[in-house]
Design a protein with these regions (language model features):
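Basic, polyanion-binding surface patches
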Residues: 1-193
Length: 193
């Protein structure tokens, strides 16, 4: 086992440690719509629930390599709406490909032939094949880190989901380190203890 002081490591090593040790992480496959009406779809794994009353979640979005805003950040800041689509094994490859650096005027969903459907409340559509989609209104945003990450707090205002997810999350995808993912295929139920 190794022990290290974070302050003595280069940034790249710190990132590698965090990405590989805090795993698996749930994946938020976020759909947004630009002011021009272009649907953006991109995956983020710095994501989780915060509270249930009200139902709040957070997602942290980095910058492009040139330091400019990613489409997801820009769209959420401009419109105040986004949809978190959960990812099943069947959607894994397309989800991964949607993380490439597409220009703002290009819809990842259209490029990857992903079928979308209208949301119940917010303007961004949901990925039709997603087993669950959480429609969110932006409640708060702030920046953290020396290379500032946009942290968005969204209130879940509508949900569309497959009923089986209330008793089993088998088949859902999580993010590991690097370009590796995991799929839930084993659940341990301790309710009898």
């Amino acid at each position: 086992m190794e022990s290290v002081k974070i302050s003595q490591l280069p940034k790249e090593k710190v990132s590698k440690l965090i990405f590989n040790l805090i795993a698996p992480r749930p994946v938020a496959w976020i759909s947004t719509v630009s002011k021009e009406g272009v649907v953006n779809l991109a995956p983020f794994s710095f994501f989780n629930a915060i509270t249930t009353k009200p139902p709040l979640l957070m997602v942290s979005v980095g910058k492009r390599k040139d330091g400019s805003l990613k489409d997801t950040s820009r769209n959420i800041k401009e419109t105040g709406e986004f949809v978190v689509n959960l990812v099943s094994r069947e959607l894994l490859e397309k989800m991964h490909l949607s993380g490439k650096d597409y220009p703002p005027q290009v819809s990842e969903a259209k490029e990857l032939n992903l079928e979308l459907e209208p949301s119940l409340i917010v303007k961004p559509p949901r990925v039709k094949a997603s087993p669950a989609s959480l429609e969110c209104l932006l409640r708060e945003t702030f920046q953290l880190g020396s290379t500032p990450m946009d942290v968005f707090i969204g209130e879940v205002v509508a949900v569309k989901y497959e009923p089986y997810l209330l008793s089993s999350q088998k088949g859902l995808v999580g993010r590991l380190g690097g370009k590796r993912y995991c799929v839930v295929d084993c659940e341990v139920d301790l309710s009898g203890i």
